[in-house]
């Protein structure tokens, strides 16, 4: 369900440990952690996700592109539409390197290692500094899968 997707995103973002549980401040105010109320964070996060999902349908891309765009920004949806219509780690990596990181000052392609199991599995954990999280949609997928397993126990 969509509630499960939002819960998986909250777990991916903050594990529910901060007031801005969906890390949605930046989309609202342009400043990280400026939302200090969990309900407002969820309202804003769901608003962004809903807009992304509508844009994904309009551009005929897969829904995981909309989830990845939650991390990268809505223009990622256009990028995927122009490059095959399906979110992949490879596409996310190219977008991170060529669009996100340079727009935030990383013009040298500097990377760092992100020690997270999904990241290590898909790409050795490499992320571009200031480039967002190329593994975001995959992490949400894994968390959604685990939630479904544990709900059956």
Question: What feature does the model see in each segment?
Answer:
Residues 3, 18, 35, 39:
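Glycine-rich phosphate-binding loop at the start of an alpha helix
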Residues 32-43, 47, 51-153:
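Non-catalytic cell-wall polysaccharide-engagement segments
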Residues 19-22, 80-82:
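Short, solvent-exposed loop/turn and secondary-structure capping segments
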Residues 18-19, 149:
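Secondary-structure boundary/capping residues
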Residues 1-17, 24, 45-46, 66-72, ...:
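Short, functionally critical alpha-helical segments immediately adjacent to catalytic or ligand/cofactor-binding
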Residues 22-30:
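Short linear capping/connector segments at secondary-structure termini
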């Amino acid at each position: 369900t969509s509630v499960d997707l939002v819960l998986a995103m909250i777990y991916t973002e903050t594990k529910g440990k901060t007031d801005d549980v969906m890390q949605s401040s930046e989309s609202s105010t342009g400043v990280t952690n400026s939302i200090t109320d969990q309900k407002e964070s969820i309202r804003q996060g769901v608003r962004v996700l809903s807009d992304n999902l509508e844009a994904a349908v309009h551009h005929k891309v897969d829904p995981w592109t909309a989830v990845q765009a939650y991390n990268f920004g809505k223009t990622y949806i256009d990028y995927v539409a122009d490059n095959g219509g399906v979110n992949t780690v490879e596409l996310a990596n190219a977008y991170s390197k060529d669009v996100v990181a340079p727009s935030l000052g990383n013009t040298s392609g500097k990377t760092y290692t992100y020690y997270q199991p999904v990241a290590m599995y898909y790409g050795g954990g490499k992320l571009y500094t200031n480039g967002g999280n190329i593994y975001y949609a995959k992490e949400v997928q894994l968390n959604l899968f685990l939630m479904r397993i544990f709900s059956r126990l």
